[in-house]
Amino acid sequence: MDHDHMHGMPRPSSSSSSSPSSMMNNGSMNEGGGHHHMKMMMHMTFFWGKNTEVLFSGWPGTSSGMYALCLIFVFFLAVLTEWLAHSSLLRGSTGDSANRAAGLIQTAVYTLRIGLAYLVMLAVMSFNAGVFLVALAGHAVGFMLFGSQTFRNTSDDRKTNYVPPSGCAC
């Protein structure tokens, strides 16, 4: 097999697999020709376990307590995302729709919601099954509390029909 197209990447030896995850795991992949070797395996499929990195380098580490804190953090991030998605702050006011201050507040809240949604998405991209499940649970609880009819007064006509929020539903 011709490896000339790999431009600076080491040729895989016959004893090791040439998949990206095995190259990272074996420490044979370097960055930009330097001598820095990756220490953490980057998963490409879902896995179970507390030894993972979520959002930040080295976090939560290998501690069970920090992993539990990470799961709680992702759960509440997803709940907060749902709260912002269904908040009355994003709905236009019925009185003065041309109010620029209200428009700026709506834009800021929308931007915050999208940023939080992307953080949840990036956390799930750690491919840790526990993180994935708590993100789903957080979105489900958040929707049940703030988006569904479960805890709403049905006499409020404005909130009886669910309209999915626009933008990223990560």
UniProtKB/Swiss-Prot annotation:
The membrane-topology field of this record reads: Multi-pass membrane protein
**Per the record, what phenotype accompanies loss of this gene's function?**
Increased root length and pollen development defects.
Superkingdom of this protein's organism? Eukaryota
Query: Which InterPro entries does this one have?
Result: Cop_transporter
May I have one GO cellular component term? membrane
* Renumbered residue ranges of the record's region Disordered: 1-29
Tissue-specificity statement: Expressed in the root apex, lateral root primordia, embryo, trichomes, guard cells and pollen grains.
Composition-biased stretches (Low complexity)? 9-29
Can you name one GO molecular function term for this protein?
Answer: copper ion transmembrane transporter activity
The recorded induction information for this protein reads: Down-regulated by treatment with high concentrations of copper.
What is the name of the protein in this document? Answer: Copper transporter 1
A Pfam family this chain is assigned to: Ctr
Subcellular location(s) of the protein = Membrane
Q: Gene symbol? A: COPT1
Q: What is this protein's function per UniProt? A: Copper transporter involved in copper acquisition and transport in leaves. Required for copper homeostasis and normal plant growth and development.
